[in-house]
A protein has these predicted regions:
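ATP-binding/phosphotransfer module of carbohydrate and carboxylate kinases, centering on a glycine-rich
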Residues: 1-68, 78-81, 103-107, 121-131, ...
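Short beta-strand segments
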Residues: 12, 68-74, 112, 134-140, ...
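Short, glycine/acidic-enriched loop or turn micro-motifs at the edges of active sites
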Residues: 15, 117, 139
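Short hydrophobic alpha-helix segments
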Residues: 33-35, 88, 155
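A short acidic/small-residue loop/turn micro-motif
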Residues: 36-39, 92, 158-161
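A charged helix-plus-loop insertion that forms the helical arch/lid used to bind
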Residues: 82-93
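Glycine/small-residue-rich loop that forms an oxyanion/phosphate-binding "nest" at active or ligand-binding sites
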Residues: 110, 116
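Glycine-rich phosphate-binding loop of actin/hexokinase-like ATP-binding domains
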Residues: 130-185
Length: 303
């Protein structure tokens, strides 16, 4: 009798939706589902359990066929215990997510920061080698770093927290307590502050206003582009990665952002032979629109 192939499960728990994937031992996607994330510690746990059981139903495999579960989630993550703290967009102050989910489904669980998980997933899905940096342009700003297929977190786990790199001491106050951090320029929260008369989706609204000829909107978008290009430059000069992958919700702005980043990098290269030699525009890649990078990366981490 042939022994059933064990699957690896990955969950990407975000503030609005949770995505779950199942990978076979060769890393191929054999199951995927999405569902709304319910907020609050107990409901986040319940969402995670429903996602795992949903994959079991979708793949026709019992929970015992799942070798491991990895979870990518925002907030402060203790990778040793699986505890999550301060995940504010999930209305979650503290949750022993790894232990409690493992008790509910009977499968080993590992928990990781969502940006690190997305970096690993992007590295796997795009079949990259060497050193890669994943730039997450979302509500906040952070980067994940992968070296030879493994996450690099630094001595204290803060490698990649470039959102809290100050670039203007006279700039806006940052939630971290500093002033003028990159996150106050290149993030969804920065756009919301700079374009307060936007609707439910300020980033999309400000781009539409810019395209309609609004001068103020054009200045907001230009500041976002300059900040995002600065992030690429920081990652290139500090890590010298082969590729810099742009992910996060803001990437969906498309050409106004991505084309603007590349144009800015090219402009800087014209002004600096040093930057020109680094060929930064060529290193920039964009995560595809419907990519499951964070969930796939979580599955890899869980193994």
């Amino acid at each position: 009798m042939t022994t059933p192939t064990l699957l690896r499960v990955g969950l990407d728990i975000g503030g609005t939706k949770t995505e779950a994937v199942a990978l076979d031992p060769n890393g191929r996607l054999v199951g995927r589902l999405r569902m709304p994330t319910e907020l609050g510690a107990e409901r986040v746990l319940a969402t995670a359990e429903r996602a795992v059981r949903g994959l079991s139903f979708q793949t026709g495999r019992p929970l015992s066929a799942f070798a491991s579960i990895g979870i990518g989630i925002p907030g402060a993550v203790d990778r040793e215990t699986g505890e999550v703290r301060h995940a504010f967009n999930l209305d979650l102050a503290e949750l022993q997510l790894g232990r409690l989910l493992s008790e509910l489904v009977g499968v080993p669980v590992r928990v990781e920061n969502d940006v690190t998980a997305a970096a690993l997933g992007a590295n796997h899905l795009l079949e990259l080698d060497g050193t890669i940096a994943y730039l997450n342009l979302g509500t906040g700003l952070a980067a994940g770093i992968v070296v030879d297929g493994a996450p690099w977190r630094g001595a204290h786990g803060v490698a990649g927290e470039i959102g809290h790199l100050p670039i203007d001491p006279n700039g806006y106050a940052c939630p971290c307590g500093q002033f003028g951090c990159l996150e106050t320029v290149a993030s969804g929260s920065a756009i919301s502050r700079a374009w307060p008369h936007g609707g439910e989706h300020p980033a999309q609204d400000v781009v539409r206003a810019m395209e309609a000829g609004d001068v103020e909107a054009a200045a907001v978008v230009a500041r976002l582009v300059q900040g995002a290009a600065s992030c690429v430059r920081v990652l290139a000069l500090s890590l010298d990665p082969q590729s810099i992958i742009i992910g996060g919700g803001l990437r969906l702005l498309g050409e106004p952002l991505i084309g603007g980043i590349r144009a800015t990098l090219e402009q800087w290269a014209e002004q600096s032979s040093f930057l020109a030699a680094l060929d930064l525009p060529r290193r920039v890649r964009v995560l595809p629109k419907h990519s499951s990078a964070a969930a796939v990366g979580a599955a890899i981490i869980g193994a």
